[in-house]
């Protein structure tokens, strides 16, 4: 599932590592803090 809890900075870093923008992270990874 793309819905998960995580550190927003780590989520952004992870998505950028996959060649995605942080907006992709917010919309798909659904990073919601801890």
UniProtKB/Swiss-Prot annotation:
Tissue-specific expression: Expressed by the venom gland.
GO CC, any one term: extracellular region
GO molecular-function terms, A-Z: potassium channel regulator activity; toxin activity
Disulphides: 6-25, 11-29, 15-31
Subcellular location: Secreted
Keyword line: Disulfide bond, Ion channel impairing toxin, Neurotoxin, Potassium channel impairing toxin, Secreted, Toxin, Voltage-gated potassium channel impairing toxin
Record's comment describing the protein's domains: Has the structural arrangement of an alpha-helix connected to antiparallel beta-sheets by disulfide bonds (CS-alpha/beta).
Free-text function comment from the UniProt entry: Toxin that blocks voltage-gated potassium channels (Kv).
Assigned protein family: Belongs to the short scorpion toxin superfamily. Potassium channel inhibitor family. Alpha-KTx 21 subfamily.
The name this protein goes by in its record: Potassium channel toxin
Organism: Tityus metuendus (Scorpion)
